[in-house]
Amino acid sequence: DGVLLAGLNREEELLPRFVHAHDGMMNTGPMGYGGKGFFVHRPLKKVTIKMETPVIYFYSDEPFKASVEVGFNGGSINQWYPQRSGGETVPKIVKPNPVPTDAQFKDAGGIDFSTSFNGQIKWDVDVLAPDASRGLSFKNGETLNWLRPRNSKANVLKVGEEYEDYLFYRGVGNFELPVTFRVDPSETLHIENTGKEALPFLFVQEVTPDRKIRFHSFSDGLPAGSSLSIPEKDLHTTDAKWRRLVYDQMVQGLLSTGLTSEEAHGMIQTWWHSYFEQPGLRVFWVVPTDKTNEILPLTVSPAPEKTVRVLVGRSEVLRPRFEQQLVEAYKVRKEKKKSAAWALNMFHRYGLAFQERVQTLSGEKIAKK
C-alpha cells in the first residue's frame, strides 16, 4: 500500500571484523560476531531505511590532504572505515538489554528513529599519489564484497594508520522517500514519483519462488510528478541467460548517471548475490542529485574540481499474495500454539518488517520494533 515498513534491523551482507561501529551497533547478531543484525546489543525502533554500501572515491594526479564530512539527515552513520576523525554521538548504553521494556529503552541506549535523528561523520584524509601501492589497502579478513568496490582507478587513501581505496560508511534511519511503490489486488505494480526532480533510471526485477526471473528496465527514468503502472504480465520473463541481460542493463543505467565503467561494474558485483539472486519483487532507482545532497550533505575541503554523486535506492515491494502467505503462516503457528513472533524473525533479513505487516493485516499485536 505504499507505506514504508519498520524493522529493517538486519544486515544483508556481513562486514569484515576491522570495520568500526558505534557501541552496540557492530556487525553481530543472535549467533555471535558476524551474525546478521546488531539489534541484540542496542535496541532500535522504527528503522525504515538502510543505507548499505556508500563509498567515496578520490581521483587526483597528485597527493594532498583533504577533510571530508558527510551528514545523514534522518539517520545514524553507525558503521564506517577507515576510523573516523569525528562525527555523531549516540546514547550511552547503561544497561544492555536485547528486549528492553519501554522504561528500560533509554538506559539500554535505544534509538527511536521516528523522532528526529541527524547523523554525521568526518575523516581527515591523506590522498596518496596515483602510483602508491595497492597492497597498502590489504587487510586480513577482507570479504568478497569488501574487495569488489576496489574495482576502480581511484587513489589509495590513508586515515591515521589505516589504508583503503575508498571511504566506507553505513547507516540506518527513518525519513520519507521521493517515490512510492504499491501493488494493487490485481498484482499490478504502481510507481509514483512524488518528488520535485526526475528519477534518472529505474529497474524492476522479480525473482519468483520457483526461481523465474522477470524484469523491466526504464532507461528514461520517471519525470517528477508522474507515475507508471506495470502489470505482472508485462514483466519480461527471461531464460537461462537472464544474469547477463540484467547485469548489462543495470550497468548501462548506472553509466548514464555518471559513474565510471569500473565503478558501475564494481557496484553491481557488490550487490549481486544479496540483491539480484534473492526471491522477491524489488525496484532499483537512482536518487535525484538534489535529494541525495539533502539526505547526505557532503563537504570536501579543499573543494574538488568535479564531484559526481550517484545514490541508488532499492525498494523491496510485497505482493498481496505474498502478504497473504505471511498471514496464513502466522495463523498456522498460532494454531500450533507456537510463539506469536513471526517464524522468520530471528533469521530472515526482513523478519521484523514482516511482523509489522502481519500485525497490520491480522489486526493483532505481535512484537515491538
Please report, for each region that a protein language model flagged, where it lies by residue.
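Protease-labile, long low-complexity intrinsically disordered regions enriched in Pro/Ser/Thr
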Residues: 1-369
